[in-house]
Amino acid sequence: MPQLRQDLITGRWVAVATERARRPDSFTQAAKESIAARDVCPFCPGHESMTPPEVLAYRPPGTMPNSEGWWIRVVPNLYAAFRLEPDGQEQRAGRFWQRDAIGACEVLISSPDHRAPTPLLPGRQVEEMVQSYVDRYRQHARNPTLEHVLILYNHGRPAGASLEHPHSQLYAIGLLPPTYLEELEGARRFFEQEGECVFCRTIADERRAGVRVVFENESFTVFAPYAARAPFETWIAPRRHVASFGDLDTGREKSALAEALQVTLRAFYDGLNDPPFNYYIHSALLKGNVADAWISDAYHWHLEIVPKLSIAAGFELGTGIWINVVKPEDSAAFLRERIAEGAGPPADASGARGVAPREPRFSAMRAIETSGGPGERLRRSP
Protein backbone atom coordinates (compact mmCIF):
# COMPACT_ATOMS: atom_id res chain seq x y z
CA MET A 1 0.00 0.00 0.00
CA PRO A 2 1.44 3.44 -0.86
CA GLN A 3 2.12 5.70 2.10
CA LEU A 4 1.63 9.38 2.78
CA ARG A 5 4.35 10.73 5.04
CA GLN A 6 4.34 14.17 6.64
CA ASP A 7 7.46 16.24 7.12
CA LEU A 8 7.74 17.09 10.82
CA ILE A 9 9.33 20.47 10.12
CA THR A 10 7.25 21.95 7.29
CA GLY A 11 4.08 19.86 7.47
CA ARG A 12 4.39 18.98 3.77
CA TRP A 13 3.06 15.62 2.65
CA VAL A 14 5.03 13.19 0.47
CA ALA A 15 3.70 10.06 -1.22
CA VAL A 16 6.00 7.05 -0.95
CA ALA A 17 4.69 4.89 -3.78
CA THR A 18 5.81 1.47 -2.57
CA GLU A 19 3.85 -0.34 -5.29
CA ARG A 20 5.77 1.64 -7.91
CA ALA A 21 9.01 1.19 -6.02
CA ARG A 22 12.25 0.61 -7.86
CA ARG A 23 15.37 -1.03 -6.53
CA PRO A 24 17.92 1.61 -5.50
CA ASP A 25 20.51 0.20 -7.89
CA SER A 26 18.12 0.67 -10.83
CA PHE A 27 18.97 4.39 -10.72
CA THR A 28 22.57 3.84 -11.84
CA GLN A 29 23.35 6.44 -14.49
CA ALA A 30 24.65 5.87 -17.99
CA ALA A 31 27.94 7.40 -19.10
CA LYS A 32 27.75 11.14 -19.78
CA GLU A 33 29.30 13.44 -22.32
CA SER A 34 31.45 16.37 -21.28
CA ILE A 35 29.66 19.72 -21.03
CA ALA A 36 32.55 22.03 -21.91
CA ALA A 37 36.10 21.50 -23.08
CA ARG A 38 38.94 22.71 -20.92
CA ASP A 39 40.37 24.96 -23.62
CA VAL A 40 37.24 27.14 -23.55
CA CYS A 41 36.39 26.87 -19.84
CA PRO A 42 36.45 30.27 -18.07
CA PHE A 43 37.14 28.60 -14.71
CA CYS A 44 40.37 26.85 -15.70
CA PRO A 45 43.79 28.28 -14.71
CA GLY A 46 45.12 30.60 -17.38
CA HIS A 47 41.63 31.85 -18.24
CA GLU A 48 41.25 34.26 -15.31
CA SER A 49 40.60 37.14 -17.72
CA MET A 50 37.40 35.39 -18.85
CA THR A 51 35.74 36.06 -15.47
CA PRO A 52 35.14 39.23 -13.45
CA PRO A 53 37.96 40.07 -11.00
CA GLU A 54 38.16 37.64 -8.08
CA VAL A 55 36.72 38.68 -4.71
CA LEU A 56 38.48 35.87 -2.85
CA ALA A 57 41.29 33.49 -3.74
CA TYR A 58 43.39 30.97 -1.86
CA ARG A 59 46.80 31.11 -3.51
CA PRO A 60 50.50 31.05 -2.52
CA PRO A 61 51.96 34.27 -1.13
CA GLY A 62 53.52 36.44 -3.79
CA THR A 63 51.20 35.47 -6.62
CA MET A 64 49.15 38.21 -8.23
CA PRO A 65 45.34 38.36 -8.03
CA ASN A 66 43.56 37.11 -11.15
CA SER A 67 46.53 35.00 -12.18
CA GLU A 68 47.33 31.30 -12.08
CA GLY A 69 48.42 29.53 -8.90
CA TRP A 70 45.14 29.50 -6.95
CA TRP A 71 43.43 26.42 -5.55
CA ILE A 72 40.13 28.14 -4.62
CA ARG A 73 38.83 31.16 -6.51
CA VAL A 74 35.61 33.17 -6.03
CA VAL A 75 34.33 35.60 -8.67
CA PRO A 76 31.09 37.53 -9.23
CA ASN A 77 28.64 35.73 -11.49
CA LEU A 78 28.86 37.24 -14.95
CA TYR A 79 25.14 36.64 -15.44
CA ALA A 80 23.89 37.75 -12.03
CA ALA A 81 20.16 37.66 -11.32
CA PHE A 82 20.66 40.00 -8.32
CA ARG A 83 22.86 43.09 -8.04
CA LEU A 84 24.13 45.25 -5.18
CA GLU A 85 23.27 48.54 -6.85
CA PRO A 86 19.80 50.11 -6.46
CA ASP A 87 18.05 50.80 -3.17
CA GLY A 88 15.41 48.10 -3.57
CA GLN A 89 12.37 50.28 -2.92
CA GLU A 90 9.05 48.58 -3.56
CA GLN A 91 6.89 50.09 -6.27
CA ARG A 92 3.37 49.60 -7.51
CA ALA A 93 2.78 48.14 -10.96
CA GLY A 94 -0.97 48.37 -11.16
CA ARG A 95 -2.28 45.93 -8.57
CA PHE A 96 1.12 44.28 -8.27
CA TRP A 97 4.26 45.03 -6.28
CA GLN A 98 7.75 45.09 -7.72
CA ARG A 99 11.20 45.98 -6.43
CA ASP A 100 14.78 45.95 -7.61
CA ALA A 101 16.49 42.56 -7.28
CA ILE A 102 19.00 43.53 -4.61
CA GLY A 103 21.71 41.00 -3.89
CA ALA A 104 24.94 39.38 -4.97
CA CYS A 105 25.64 36.29 -7.07
CA GLU A 106 29.04 34.63 -6.90
CA VAL A 107 30.76 31.58 -8.35
CA LEU A 108 32.99 29.61 -5.98
CA ILE A 109 35.43 27.57 -8.09
CA SER A 110 36.23 24.43 -6.09
CA SER A 111 39.44 23.33 -7.80
CA PRO A 112 41.81 24.24 -10.63
CA ASP A 113 41.19 20.73 -12.04
CA HIS A 114 38.53 20.86 -14.75
CA ARG A 115 37.48 17.22 -14.31
CA ALA A 116 37.50 16.91 -10.52
CA PRO A 117 33.94 16.90 -9.15
CA THR A 118 33.60 17.19 -5.39
CA PRO A 119 33.38 13.40 -4.75
CA LEU A 120 36.85 12.99 -6.28
CA LEU A 121 38.63 15.96 -4.70
CA PRO A 122 41.35 15.33 -2.10
CA GLY A 123 40.00 15.73 1.41
CA ARG A 124 42.04 18.86 2.10
CA GLN A 125 40.62 20.50 -1.02
CA VAL A 126 37.06 19.85 0.20
CA GLU A 127 38.01 21.49 3.49
CA GLU A 128 39.24 24.53 1.59
CA MET A 129 35.99 24.59 -0.38
CA VAL A 130 34.01 24.58 2.88
CA GLN A 131 36.24 27.36 4.22
CA SER A 132 35.44 29.47 1.15
CA TYR A 133 31.73 28.90 1.84
CA VAL A 134 32.16 30.19 5.39
CA ASP A 135 34.29 33.17 4.35
CA ARG A 136 31.82 34.38 1.74
CA TYR A 137 28.79 33.67 3.92
CA ARG A 138 30.22 35.78 6.72
CA GLN A 139 31.17 38.56 4.32
CA HIS A 140 27.63 38.93 2.99
CA ALA A 141 26.03 38.44 6.41
CA ARG A 142 27.57 41.78 7.43
CA ASN A 143 25.62 43.64 4.74
CA PRO A 144 22.51 45.15 6.41
CA THR A 145 20.55 45.22 3.13
CA LEU A 146 20.71 41.44 2.70
CA GLU A 147 18.30 39.03 4.37
CA HIS A 148 19.36 35.58 3.20
CA VAL A 149 22.41 33.75 1.85
CA LEU A 150 22.08 30.51 -0.10
CA ILE A 151 25.10 28.43 -1.09
CA LEU A 152 24.44 25.70 -3.64
CA TYR A 153 26.14 23.22 -5.94
CA ASN A 154 24.70 21.96 -9.24
CA HIS A 155 26.31 18.81 -10.61
CA GLY A 156 25.49 17.61 -14.11
CA ARG A 157 23.41 19.12 -16.88
CA PRO A 158 20.05 17.73 -15.59
CA ALA A 159 20.78 19.49 -12.29
CA GLY A 160 21.37 22.84 -13.98
CA ALA A 161 25.16 22.85 -14.41
CA SER A 162 26.11 24.64 -17.63
CA LEU A 163 29.86 24.18 -17.07
CA GLU A 164 31.62 20.94 -16.16
CA HIS A 165 34.35 22.60 -14.10
CA PRO A 166 33.43 22.05 -10.41
CA HIS A 167 31.98 25.16 -8.86
CA SER A 168 29.41 26.22 -6.31
CA GLN A 169 27.23 29.31 -6.36
CA LEU A 170 26.25 31.85 -3.74
CA TYR A 171 23.13 34.00 -3.77
CA ALA A 172 22.87 36.77 -1.18
CA ILE A 173 19.43 38.37 -1.51
CA GLY A 174 17.39 41.13 0.05
CA LEU A 175 14.34 39.07 0.99
CA LEU A 176 13.47 35.87 2.84
CA PRO A 177 12.64 33.03 0.42
CA PRO A 178 9.41 31.02 0.87
CA THR A 179 11.21 27.72 1.46
CA TYR A 180 13.18 29.16 4.36
CA LEU A 181 10.09 30.87 5.79
CA GLU A 182 8.24 27.56 5.66
CA GLU A 183 10.99 25.86 7.65
CA LEU A 184 11.23 28.79 10.03
CA GLU A 185 7.50 28.75 10.74
CA GLY A 186 7.58 25.00 11.38
CA ALA A 187 10.56 25.42 13.70
CA ARG A 188 8.80 28.23 15.60
CA ARG A 189 5.62 26.22 15.98
CA PHE A 190 7.46 23.13 17.26
CA PHE A 191 9.58 25.19 19.66
CA GLU A 192 6.50 26.84 21.14
CA GLN A 193 4.73 23.49 21.57
CA GLU A 194 7.63 21.27 22.62
CA GLY A 195 10.23 23.68 23.97
CA GLU A 196 13.05 22.36 21.79
CA CYS A 197 14.48 22.58 18.29
CA VAL A 198 12.62 20.40 15.79
CA PHE A 199 15.86 19.72 13.92
CA CYS A 200 17.61 18.57 17.10
CA ARG A 201 14.66 16.30 17.85
CA THR A 202 14.74 14.92 14.31
CA ILE A 203 18.47 14.21 14.46
CA ALA A 204 18.11 12.48 17.84
CA ASP A 205 15.17 10.38 16.59
CA GLU A 206 17.04 9.37 13.43
CA ARG A 207 20.13 8.36 15.40
CA ARG A 208 18.00 6.35 17.79
CA ALA A 209 16.13 4.53 15.01
CA GLY A 210 19.21 4.11 12.82
CA VAL A 211 17.40 2.83 9.72
CA ARG A 212 17.72 6.10 7.79
CA VAL A 213 21.21 7.06 9.00
CA VAL A 214 23.78 6.99 6.21
CA PHE A 215 26.96 8.16 7.96
CA GLU A 216 28.11 9.80 11.17
CA ASN A 217 31.24 11.39 12.51
CA GLU A 218 31.90 13.29 15.71
CA SER A 219 30.03 16.42 14.58
CA PHE A 220 27.54 15.55 11.81
CA THR A 221 24.78 13.06 11.09
CA VAL A 222 23.92 12.17 7.50
CA PHE A 223 20.44 10.71 7.01
CA ALA A 224 17.61 10.21 4.56
CA PRO A 225 14.66 12.28 5.84
CA TYR A 226 11.52 10.36 6.80
CA ALA A 227 9.44 12.28 4.24
CA ALA A 228 12.09 12.45 1.51
CA ARG A 229 10.71 14.18 -1.58
CA ALA A 230 12.86 12.36 -4.12
CA PRO A 231 14.89 9.15 -4.42
CA PHE A 232 18.09 9.39 -2.36
CA GLU A 233 17.35 12.81 -0.86
CA THR A 234 19.90 13.08 1.95
CA TRP A 235 20.54 15.65 4.68
CA ILE A 236 23.75 16.53 6.50
CA ALA A 237 23.08 18.20 9.86
CA PRO A 238 25.34 19.31 12.71
CA ARG A 239 24.58 17.67 16.04
CA ARG A 240 25.58 20.88 17.82
CA HIS A 241 22.58 23.18 17.84
CA VAL A 242 23.45 26.22 15.73
CA ALA A 243 21.10 28.31 13.60
CA SER A 244 23.57 29.94 11.22
CA PHE A 245 26.09 28.32 8.92
CA GLY A 246 28.24 31.38 9.53
CA ASP A 247 28.85 30.09 13.07
CA LEU A 248 30.48 26.88 11.83
CA ASP A 249 33.65 26.18 13.80
CA THR A 250 36.39 26.36 11.19
CA GLY A 251 38.52 23.83 13.01
CA ARG A 252 37.11 20.40 13.80
CA GLU A 253 33.60 21.12 12.51
CA LYS A 254 34.89 22.29 9.15
CA SER A 255 36.91 19.09 8.76
CA ALA A 256 33.97 16.97 9.87
CA LEU A 257 31.60 18.67 7.43
CA ALA A 258 34.08 18.19 4.60
CA GLU A 259 34.32 14.50 5.46
CA ALA A 260 30.56 14.00 5.72
CA LEU A 261 29.96 15.77 2.41
CA GLN A 262 32.72 13.96 0.55
CA VAL A 263 31.85 10.50 1.90
CA THR A 264 28.18 10.96 1.03
CA LEU A 265 28.78 12.30 -2.47
CA ARG A 266 31.30 9.57 -3.12
CA ALA A 267 28.68 6.98 -2.16
CA PHE A 268 26.44 8.53 -4.84
CA TYR A 269 29.35 8.49 -7.28
CA ASP A 270 30.26 4.85 -6.60
CA GLY A 271 26.73 3.47 -6.26
CA LEU A 272 24.86 5.45 -8.92
CA ASN A 273 27.67 6.13 -11.40
CA ASP A 274 28.06 9.85 -10.79
CA PRO A 275 24.42 10.99 -10.91
CA PRO A 276 23.34 14.61 -11.36
CA PHE A 277 22.46 16.26 -8.08
CA ASN A 278 21.92 19.55 -6.30
CA TYR A 279 22.93 20.42 -2.80
CA TYR A 280 22.25 23.61 -0.89
CA ILE A 281 22.68 24.99 2.61
CA HIS A 282 19.66 26.22 4.53
CA SER A 283 20.72 28.68 7.21
CA ALA A 284 19.42 31.57 9.29
CA LEU A 285 21.16 34.87 8.61
CA LEU A 286 21.19 36.40 12.08
CA LYS A 287 21.29 40.19 12.41
CA GLY A 288 21.70 40.47 16.17
CA ASN A 289 18.25 41.95 16.78
CA VAL A 290 15.43 40.91 19.12
CA ALA A 291 13.80 38.64 16.52
CA ASP A 292 17.00 36.63 16.27
CA ALA A 293 16.67 35.37 19.85
CA TRP A 294 13.96 32.81 19.14
CA ILE A 295 15.42 31.97 15.72
CA SER A 296 18.72 31.08 17.39
CA ASP A 297 16.83 28.71 19.70
CA ALA A 298 14.42 27.20 17.18
CA TYR A 299 16.24 26.98 13.85
CA HIS A 300 19.14 24.71 12.85
CA TRP A 301 21.24 25.02 9.70
CA HIS A 302 21.65 21.95 7.50
CA LEU A 303 22.70 20.85 4.03
CA GLU A 304 20.26 19.05 1.70
CA ILE A 305 21.36 16.85 -1.22
CA VAL A 306 18.76 16.01 -3.87
CA PRO A 307 19.90 13.78 -6.76
CA LYS A 308 18.07 14.36 -10.04
CA LEU A 309 16.85 10.81 -10.58
CA SER A 310 13.18 11.55 -11.20
CA ILE A 311 11.16 14.34 -12.77
CA ALA A 312 8.62 16.57 -11.06
CA ALA A 313 5.63 16.18 -13.38
CA GLY A 314 2.07 17.46 -13.44
CA PHE A 315 0.98 15.93 -10.14
CA GLU A 316 3.93 17.34 -8.19
CA LEU A 317 3.63 20.76 -9.81
CA GLY A 318 -0.14 20.85 -9.46
CA THR A 319 -0.38 19.71 -5.84
CA GLY A 320 2.99 20.37 -4.24
CA ILE A 321 2.96 16.73 -3.11
CA TRP A 322 6.04 14.84 -4.26
CA ILE A 323 5.95 11.16 -5.21
CA ASN A 324 9.03 9.24 -4.13
CA VAL A 325 9.41 5.76 -5.63
CA VAL A 326 12.23 4.68 -3.30
CA LYS A 327 11.66 4.30 0.44
CA PRO A 328 14.10 6.48 2.38
CA GLU A 329 15.02 3.45 4.48
CA ASP A 330 16.09 1.60 1.31
CA SER A 331 18.11 4.50 -0.09
CA ALA A 332 19.91 4.92 3.26
CA ALA A 333 20.75 1.21 3.37
CA PHE A 334 22.05 1.35 -0.21
CA LEU A 335 24.34 4.30 0.57
CA ARG A 336 25.56 2.68 3.80
CA GLU A 337 26.56 -0.40 1.82
CA ARG A 338 28.47 1.68 -0.70
CA ILE A 339 30.34 3.45 2.12
CA ALA A 340 31.07 0.16 3.89
CA GLU A 341 32.51 -1.28 0.69
CA GLY A 342 35.01 1.57 0.62
CA ALA A 343 35.44 1.31 -3.14
CA GLY A 344 37.53 4.18 -4.50
CA PRO A 345 36.65 6.23 -7.56
CA PRO A 346 38.42 5.55 -10.85
CA ALA A 347 41.96 6.89 -11.01
CA ASP A 348 42.54 9.99 -13.10
CA ALA A 349 45.05 10.20 -15.92
CA SER A 350 47.92 10.59 -13.47
CA GLY A 351 46.86 7.51 -11.52
CA ALA A 352 45.85 9.56 -8.47
CA ARG A 353 42.62 8.91 -6.66
CA GLY A 354 40.41 11.52 -5.06
CA VAL A 355 40.53 10.23 -1.49
CA ALA A 356 42.16 7.38 0.36
CA PRO A 357 40.11 4.16 0.78
CA ARG A 358 38.03 4.10 3.95
CA GLU A 359 37.70 1.48 6.62
CA PRO A 360 34.41 -0.43 6.30
CA ARG A 361 32.68 1.16 9.29
CA PHE A 362 30.22 3.80 8.24
CA SER A 363 29.82 5.37 11.70
CA ALA A 364 33.47 5.69 12.65
CA MET A 365 35.17 9.08 12.65
CA ARG A 366 38.12 9.15 10.26
CA ALA A 367 40.71 11.82 9.66
CA ILE A 368 40.38 13.82 6.48
CA GLU A 369 42.94 12.68 3.91
CA THR A 370 45.34 15.55 3.32
CA SER A 371 47.82 14.43 0.70
CA GLY A 372 47.73 16.31 -2.56
CA GLY A 373 45.95 19.34 -1.05
CA PRO A 374 47.27 22.87 -0.96
CA GLY A 375 50.21 22.96 1.39
CA GLU A 376 51.14 26.60 1.59
CA ARG A 377 49.71 29.28 3.82
CA LEU A 378 46.51 30.73 2.45
CA ARG A 379 46.46 34.15 0.90
CA ARG A 380 42.99 35.63 0.78
CA SER A 381 42.70 38.44 -1.71
CA PRO A 382 40.22 41.22 -0.87
List each language-model region with its residue ranges.
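HIT superfamily nucleotide-processing domains
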Residues: 1-382
